[in-house]
A protein has these predicted regions:
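Conserved acidic residues
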Residues: 73, 121, 151
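Short glycine-rich phosphate-binding loop at a beta-alpha junction
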Residues: 70-79, 154
Length: 216
């Protein structure tokens, strides 16, 4: 996994915290839709309300494309949260645009991908959040099945679990992110939002997320 340079990653982390797209509550944890208890919750859709935030994400994505020498023919967003940022990036790069559903429609032409992906087209997949990587890699496989060549996945935020890194490596798919959970946690401490004890609780969760709830 490739992350933005430290100053850029810190700025994105501060952006997420400022807009409450990422909320951190180690002493009053959240329950995710999966049922897992966690000290953090991420909803990057809150960034859509701010033109400044959207433009900051777009600039970050463009920097990654330049650094990786990516020249996509198509930018494909994951439905639904990846679509706005994919649209912004495609407009900036002057590329085609598509989006990938979580499942094919049950009616009409039963498409999984909306928008054209020509055979052998270079495709960049845009996701807002990477946790386990399952949904992003599912979209990658859908693009590959459609005949596209996936350059990689771009995401705003990743939890940066070891298992996620392994999953992307196994899929032979580069993952580039603007910032990560450890960076957000550090910025939350340096900005006075969290104390050192709370930061340790976050580190404990990141090390063993499945077991964390029983220890707090």
């Amino acid at each position: 996994m490739t992350t933005a340079d430290a100053p850029d990653a810190d700025r994105i982390a501060e952006l997420l915290l400022h807009h409450q797209a990422v909320q951190v509550r180690p002493r009053d944890p959240f329950t995710w839709s999966s049922g897992r208890v966690a000290p953090i919750y991420c909803d990057n859709r809150l960034l859509l309300s701010s033109a400044t935030a959207r433009n900051t994400v777009q600039r970050g994505f463009v920097k990654h494309c330049i650094a990786a020498s990516w020249q996509p023919d198509v930018v494909a967003g994951t439905a639904t949260a990846g679509i706005p940022h994919a649209t912004s990036l495609a407009d900036r790069l002057g590329t085609g645009l598509a989006y990938v559903r979580s499942a094919a429609k049950a009616h009409g032409r039963q498409r999984r991908i909306e928008g054209r992906i020509p055979d052998d087209a270079s495709v960049l997949v845009v996701e807002d959040l990477v946790a386990t990587g399952g949904s992003a890699l599912d979209a990658v496989q859908a693009v590959r099945n459609a005949g596209g060549h996936v350059l990689g996945v771009l995401a705003i935020f990743a939890y940066d679990f070891d298992a996620t890194r392994t999953a992307f490596a196994d899929a032979q798919c580069p993952l580039h992110v603007l910032t990560t959970f450890p960076t957000v946690a550090d910025v939350a401490v340096s900005s006075g939002r969290l104390d050192a004890d709370a930061r340790q609780l976050l580190a404990d969760w990141h090390q063993a997320p499945a077991d964390w709830a029983s220890s707090v």
